[in-house]
């Protein structure tokens, strides 16, 4: 009995140890238990899916796509399948938006140098600015080109050019002349802050941003071209100033993009030609000219511009002369039929001497869909057709009567055939003789 108490003490000590070490052991056991529970639930879910997945396959095939929107079911049921293509289309649209943004990005810096003008370090501007810098000798022909293109005034540009020329005159000297083009290059890009308004007004028709880029370049080139040509005396500077207001820096922007606004300048003379053609044609025949010859002239203008007045003018005149020779009734027919009546007037000219009214009616009916009415009227008017119809009716009646007579004759034949049927009765009587013989044998 004595060893009992110490055992109890040891047991209590063990319990205390388990009590102290219990939380750590439980913390270690919890994660595997949770993993087991999750695995069991996943297995149950998979079984449930398999059970529900086997039912539609066994029952109706792809009829239960709505109740099972899983990816596996979508792979097997190719009924819908359009969702994949929609996703691909979304990706394609995203790829399409990316190049739009890439194209829009260069337009922003293209507009920035026109407003801020200081960041002249764009790739296009560097390449263009490097040429006039090291080659000051080739710059004077640029000035001559500008003088040839002089057409529009700009006072602000002239004042700024005078200031730059005076500064260059004050800094007379060999070493300073090398710095003069640099200062002019720095001041010149600041000058287009004023003329971009006029430049944009001239380039609105072209709707091209390239016309805005060469503004600082052209101004810098002209400024550099003028500064090295300025000698030490200020008198020559005044002469260059008188030449400077004539070029007017904005004209350079309009002279370079001439290749761009050519469609605009060509459209303006086309409009003038369009206006002149109907004006010249409305005098002899206003109704027909507005309908037929104008589209031909427009087509010729779009194809070949210089050949428009040569081909369109005389052709329209000859057409007018031919149409004036026609009567007023032919003109009305052309107005009703439209462009499809061009071949009809020459056809109408033939029946002028014979039957103008009937010829016009025939043309109108040929163009319309009432061609079936004329044959009906002609059939009613022709006596031959009526006679043929009457004869056909009589012949049909006779044929019907003949058929009736044939039927009656056959009926009579059937009646006569009844008498002939009685003859076999006699034969039947003769056939009864063997019956008597049989009776005799019996």
UniProtKB/Swiss-Prot annotation:
Annotated stretches, region: Disordered: 1-25, 55-85, 151-175, 180-199, 225-244, 252-327, 339-372, 419-442
Membrane topology reported for the UniProt record: Single-pass type I membrane protein
Compositional bias segments (type: Basic and acidic residues): 433-442
Residues carrying the site annotation Cleavage of ectodomain: 383-384
Listed Acidic residues bias regions: 61-75
Keyword Membrane: yes
Signal peptide from the UniProt entry: 1-44
Cross-referenced Pfam families: Syndecan
Entry comment describing in which tissues the protein is expressed: High levels in neonatal brain, heart, and Schwann cells, barely detectable in neonatal or adult liver, or adult brain.
SMART domains given in the database record: 4.1m
One GO MF term: identical protein binding
Residue spans, topological domain Cytoplasmic: 409-442
Keywords: Cell membrane, Glycoprotein, Heparan sulfate, Membrane, Phosphoprotein, Proteoglycan, Signal, Transmembrane, Transmembrane helix
Coiled-coil zones: none
Compositional bias per record (Polar residues), positions renumbered to this chain: 289-303
Transmembrane portions of the chain: 388-408
Membrane-side (Extracellular) residue stretches: 45-387
GO cellular component: axon; cell surface; membrane; microspike; plasma membrane; protein-containing complex
Post-translational modifications: O-glycosylated within the Thr/Ser-rich region which could interact with lectin domains on other molecules.
Similarity annotation: Belongs to the syndecan proteoglycan family.
Assembly and binders: Interacts with TIAM1. Interacts (via heparan sulfate chains) with PTN; this interaction mediates the neurite outgrowth-promoting signal from PTN to the cytoskeleton of growing neurites; this interaction mediates osteoblast recruitment. Interacts with MDK; this interaction induces SDC3 clustering; this interaction induces neuronal cell adhesion and neurite outgrowth.
PANTHER family the record matches: SYNDECAN, SYNDECAN-3
Name of the protein: Syndecan-3
